[in-house]
Amino acid sequence: MTNSNRIKLTWISFFSYALTGALVIVTGMVMGDIANYFQLPVSSMSNTFTFLNAGILISIFLNAWLMEIVPLKTQLRFGFVLMVAAVAGLMVSHSIALFSVSMFVLGLVSGITMSIGTFLITHMYEGRQRGARLLFTDSFFSMAGMIFPMVAAVLLARSIEWYWVYACIGLVYVAIFVLTFGCEFPVLGKKAEQSTQPVAKEKWGIGVLFLSVAALCYILGQLGFISWVPEYAKGLGMSLNDAGKLVSDFWMSYMFGMWAFSFILRFFDLQRILTVLAGLATVLMYLFINGAPEHMAWFILTLGFFSSAIYTSIITLGSLQTKVASPKLVNFVLTCGTIGTMLTFVVTGPIVAHSGPLAALQTANGLYAVVFVMCLILGFVTRHRQHNTVAASH
């Protein structure tokens, strides 16, 4: 593989994460305007965004098999057609049914693209370099999550219709589409086996189970925590602005943490540093929940920084459980994380209704503790060290 080809594939991975981040995080900014557009209450409007999450979940799950049947380049180019159709559907839709279908299609495109982006990084880079690259790729999710809400705010403040926000997000996919030209993609499935020596099928091992549970609990814990921080802070007497600032501080610190750890991770054993970070994050969340209100900003800043590398490290360790990075394995761990996203309000909603926001934060803290335990147990069964040694000797 030429260096210029590797750079193009890496940028496709970066943009794939940016696309998903933009679609998921911009939801809160546009929901009110969309509800007014369809003359519906915001509460019922929020349910239609489940179609976006469902599309992401289904496509990540199915793409583990699709990757071996449909070439990656074909998938990305067909995704461009679907993206244009979905944005056009949003622009002309005056029925909630067409809006829901368009959201589902956006989710499908986003999930397929992100699973391809994740696989490309795990395929092109080995060992510790893989973890660092995947972490830097994941930072584009947060970066898009910071940029596109600002774009949405500017457009909506000028009374420009909400669907132009999605047209702007579509420009990210235009960049992916352009990069597919003159770019060679890895060949998977039967065609790959004909051109190379047959690869013996590897068993995943019990470590993948621990990592999958960790991925689900981490995302469910993180989103369950950050979704209810504003309500919890307001309950302590904070203003709406101060409560919102806690959330923005968390994501800002999270992004800086990703950049820092993309360099730091190269010098440590991935399972050991993951266990330390999961333990630190659990303690910091406990201190945030039980500490004095004047210290909350510091605790959430440090929590954002030290928890930023956890999810990507889980995915990277998953990919290192086999000698050759398996798209099915990577997608399985990703799917478990996405299930955590889907369950966020299913799990925390009833808890808040019954016991208040504090109980939701304590539940999230318990889930982080489960992540720590899973990472600790993983140390006894992980295969990444023997595969790293093999990779280093080649």
Curated annotation (Swiss-Prot):
PROSITE patterns, per the entry: MFS (PS50850)
Residues spanning the membrane: 11-31, 51-71, 78-98, 101-121, 134-154, 162-182, 206-226, 250-270, 273-293, 297-317, 332-352, 361-381
Species the sequence originates in: Enterobacter sp. (strain 638)
Similarity comment text for this entry: Belongs to the major facilitator superfamily. TsgA family.
Bilayer disposition of the protein: Multi-pass membrane protein
Protein name (Swiss-Prot/TrEMBL): Protein TsgA homolog
Recorded GO MF terms: transmembrane transporter activity
Keywords: Cell inner membrane, Cell membrane, Membrane, Transmembrane, Transmembrane helix
Record carries keyword Transmembrane: yes
Domain of life from the UniProt record: Bacteria
